[in-house]
Amino acid sequence: MARQTPITRYRNIGISAHIDAGKTTTTERILFYTGVSHKIGEVHDGAATMDWMEQEQERGITITSAATTCFWSGMGNQFPQHRINVIDTPGHVDFTIEVERSMRVLDGACMVYCAVGGVQPQSETVWRQANKYKVPRLAFVNKMDRTGANFFRVVEQMKTRLGANPVPIVVPIGAEDTFTGVVDLIEMKAIIWDEASQGMKFEYGEIPADLVDTAQEWRTNMVEAAAEASEELMDKYLEEGDLSKEDIIAGLRARTLASEIQVMLCGSAFKNKGVQRMLDAVIEFLPSPTEVKAIEGILDDKDETKASREASDEAPFSALAFKIMNDKFVGNLTFVRVYSGVLKQGDAVYNPVKSKRERIGRIVQMHANERQDIDEIRAGDIAACVGLKDVTTGDTLCDEKNIITLERMEFPDPVIQLAVEPKTKADQEKMSIALGRLAKEDPSFRVHTDEESGQTIIAGMGELHLDIIVDRMKREFGVEANIGKPMVAYRETIKKTVEQEGKLVRQTGGKGKFGHVYVRLEPLDVEAAGKEYEFAEEVVGGVVPKEFFGAVDKGIQERMKNGVLAGYPVVGVKAVLFDGSYHDVDSDELSFKMAGSYAFRDGFMKADPVLLEPIMKVEVETPEDYMGDIMGDLNRRRGMVQGMDDLPGGTKAIKAEVPLAEMFGYATQMRSMSQGRATYSMEFAKYAETPRNVAEGIIAKFQAGGKKGDDE
């Protein structure tokens, strides 16, 4: 089967934004105008097509990025048909992992901002992620029909808050309830959408007289931005004082692809205005898979040679599994982005991360949660495969004759954990299956069993993250469970270098045990080293035989899992085995493993041990009247205020760093202090030393036989 759409007419885009900027509604409209969905779904009724998990519809927020394929030929059918793969990404900080994950597989992004709220904290997080993956993007200012809407203020905020370089190619006609359409600065005509056809039809008209000057000023700004793309365009502009439509589009496109500018549009998705022009901009300014840098990976050879894969059907097959979802009808769905080559139904693929080959059962193209079976996928495609058993998020799938491992995704460690206990014996097995599946879908969610208490501990990126996991466990898998209080994921580390002996000698009749080591423990800078633990040996003259080095390392690592101070995992330690002795008959692996463990346990307590706690970056937006109370409350929570910004409408944004331990129940307290008018967002910033008075309480509880984490 030949390719239906040339790869140059593909656009793989993500739509991402702050909560409530109207992102899901925008995506809904895209599906409506491109003819995929015949009834517009409204988030207000809980019927939006992209928000297809029940929890999303109830909470009105998007949690999992659904991938959808649609086709567009332009508002006035002025383009050949293009295929647009849209990935809807969540806007809540607890789900930043989903955004990070989709940024990896996108070629371009559309950032949606609220015309009233402007650039909010989450917008900055998403912007940083897009910068990290060098994703070309355009901006769409939504909700132009809302009271307080101001397009030009958002343009300013993009410059000041994001350090962006926005170039509007439309300006709004009216705002709030007088918002009727936009002036297209490239055509220099007004676009008015027909309300009866829900915006399917539109007409070009004259620019309203009171907008002519504004439109001219912003057009000049746009043409200058386009002219800066090349010397040739600049010369043309200086000679003629203007550029043709084709030159403007070519110039803006070149600069958008280089991430030098962000083309900016506006509209109201809810009122069916502006999204159509934004779709045209996706075709005009965002890259096809052939226009972004070829994906890089590592070949399967001794030297781990770096290589790249061109976006072409002729190249060997390579793809990245960027999302795994459980579907109650077909089982595991693995979403893949194909970078090169062709994959047909029934083909075998190789997963170099797991060293396994698997056969593809079915291939389906998703439209939100409806699926269509297809026979093959080619370079540039995004689709889901059915029947892959051992693939986890971030794995590479490739041709087994041309093995390549694409760059892995990085997933942050969880900062909050809680205990879950099944209510009945029957729930026990269901719970472990459910948690296993959910952890496979979401790499920022972890599950482990606490060795001392035997409890199942789940860990994630925030309270909302874990709430939703527990909720899904109940709904999708029918598991009834009791939920413990949230606990902070503390860590332990050392501040000075020590040398310590560790010895195990047992003489009982027959073969005894003998292991004897000297270990040096040194503080390790986790950020600089890029790892939490390092083992080295400086043994001279075979005083400890080589075959026992691994056992010593293992003994230390096992002891680090449940730290010495308060039972929390130890990080930031370099252990060096430098001396010891052995016995010809009695020495074995177990003896040296125990000796290593003892040396670590005793040395750790002498090396200035400290407890580390997760510190969160908190941003509170509050009306000025409540600022004093909110600042005072943050200080009481051991918060450090980092700065303040003035927002429109007498609102202040307070940025602070606050220990996670002090943030439980913050939402309720903040609401009552501000009569429900303040909002906040929170994301993990770093680990820092816990103040002595706080740490002493946690350690005393642990030593008195209390369970770790009972820091309430």
Swiss-Prot record:
Pfam families linked: EFG_C (PF00679), EFG_III (PF14492), EFG_IV (PF03764), GTP_EFTU (PF00009), GTP_EFTU_D2 (PF03144)
Annotated residues for binding of GTP: 17-24, 88-92, 142-145
Compartment list: Cytoplasm
Swiss-Prot/TrEMBL keywords: Cytoplasm, Elongation factor, GTP-binding, Nucleotide-binding, Protein biosynthesis
One Gene Ontology CC term in the entry: cytoplasm
Stored CDD domains: EF-G, EFG_III, EFG_mtEFG1_IV, EFG_mtEFG_C, EFG_mtEFG_II
Domain tr-type G: 8-290
Database matches in InterPro entries: EFG_II, EFG_III, EFG_III/V, EFG_IV, EFG_V, EFG_V-like, EFTu-like_2, G_TR_CS
SMART domains registered for this protein in UniProt: EFG_C, EFG_IV
Major localization listed first in the record, in broad terms: cytoplasm
GO molecular function: GTP binding; GTPase activity; guanosine tetraphosphate binding; translation elongation factor activity
Matching SUPFAM superfamilies: EF-G C-terminal domain-like, P-loop containing nucleoside triphosphate hydrolases, Ribosomal protein S5 domain 2-like, Translation proteins
HAMAP family reported in the protein's UniProt record: EF_G_EF_2_B
Protein known as: Elongation factor G
